UniProtKB/Swiss-Prot annotation:
Keywords: Ribonucleoprotein, Ribosomal protein, RNA-binding, rRNA-binding. Residues 110-142 are annotated as: Disordered. This is Small ribosomal subunit protein bS6. It holds the Pfam family Ribosomal_S6. The gene is rpsF.
């Protein structure tokens, strides 16, 4: 399975129940095609960068998932035929570096420290520990 991110923007005229229904529909599309949703971000109503179909605002939703490439065609088709979807994008993460970035985004969305950040913190902790030892040795020699 490959790593993907999808974001879609729904019309601002939808009521809360309709928004939840649309979100659940797209989540089910992913899971019914043997995809695994790692995490998602419900970003809520936001201003659009520019007007789309006479709308200045839209409801944003992002999902990070793993799926087979064949499922993406169906997901994009369903986005296109739904009049309530103003815009959508599906991003595929391919290279090792991109997959690491995908994991970092998932960790951030889940409010966990990312793998890269943990490595940095361990290095920083070791460095500060050595600095403290050096300072304490220097103060004893006076």
């Amino acid at each position: 399975m490959r790593h993907y991110e999808t974001m879609f923007i729904l019309k601002p005229t939808l009521v809360e129940e309709e928004i939840k229904s649309k979100i659940e529909f797209y989540k089910e599309v992913i899971t019914k095609h043997h995809g695994v949703i790692e995490t998602s971000l419900d970003m809520g109503m936001r201003n659009l960068a520019y007007e789309i179909k006479k709308h200045k605002r839209g409801y944003y939703y992002v999902a990070y998932f793993k799926a087979e490439p064949s499922m993406i065609v169906e997901l994009e088709r369903l986005y296109r035929i739904n009049e309530d979807v103003l815009r959508f994008i599906v991003i595929k993460y391919e290279s090792k570096k991109e997959v690491e970035a995908w994991h970092a985004l998932v960790d951030r969305a889940n409010k966990k420290p990312s793998h890269a950040k943990e490595k940095h913190e361990k290095t920083e902790h070791t460095h500060s520990h050595h600095t403290e030892e050096a300072e304490s040795v220097g103060s004893h020699s006076e």
